[in-house]
Swiss-Prot record:
Its EC number is 2.7.4.6. Belongs to the NDK family. GO terms for cellular component: cytoplasm. One of its GO terms (molecular function) is metal ion binding. The active site is at residue 115. The gene is ndk. PROSITE patterns: NDPK_LIKE. Pfam families: NDK. It is an enzyme of class 2 (transferase). It comes from Leptospira interrogans serogroup Icterohaemorrhagiae serovar Lai (strain 56601). It catalyses: a 2'-deoxyribonucleoside 5'-diphosphate + ATP = a 2'-deoxyribonucleoside 5'-triphosphate + ADP; a ribonucleoside 5'-diphosphate + ATP = a ribonucleoside 5'-triphosphate + ADP. Its cofactor is Mg(2+). The lineage of its organism: Bacteria, Pseudomonadati, Spirochaetota, Spirochaetia, Leptospirales. This is Nucleoside diphosphate kinase.
Length: 137
């Protein structure tokens, strides 16, 4: 079993896709270890996305991610990172396979409904950013 971190982004929350996405998580065989509904401060968004700080989209990304509530979750199943990446689809919803979360719910490449860790190492870092050990079950 491995873990991954997922986030339902502000557009996914605003457009009322949280229930559908959580249902999909369970249908895909993930165990939800931790779940939080919160609004990131701009400072927290900058810290979370600091790996992108040199990229031209960094400030827009941080402003967007702190613009409204998000849902953060730690998930577990076999091949968690890879499986979640397959479930959500390509970053650009125009390129996402039919039936993936981004094909179904994303507005654009930027407002693409969900985030998913891209490696086991990043999953561990991202989970620890949002959850303390006693908050995971």
């Amino acid at each position: 079993m491995s873990r991954t971190f997922i986030m339902i982004k502000p557009d996914g929350v605003k457009n009322k896709h949280v229930g559908n996405i959580l249902s999909r998580i369970e249908k895909e065989g993930f165990k939800i270890l931790g779940l939080k509904y919160l609004k990131l401060s701009l400072e927290d968004a900058k810290q979370f996305y600091k790996v992108h700080s040199a990229r031209p989209f960094y400030n827009d990304l941080c402003n967007y991610m702190s613009s409204g509530p998000i849902v953060a979750a730690a998930l577990e199943r076999d091949n968690a990172v890879l499986h979640w990446r397959e479930v959500i689809g390509a970053t650009d919803p125009k390129e996402a396979a039919a039936g993936t979360i981004r094909a179904l719910y994303a507005e654009s490449k930027e407002a693409n409904a969900v985030h998913g860790s891209d490696s086991d190492d990043n999953a561990a870092l991202e989970i620890s950013f949002f959850f303390k050990g006693n908050e995971l079950f």
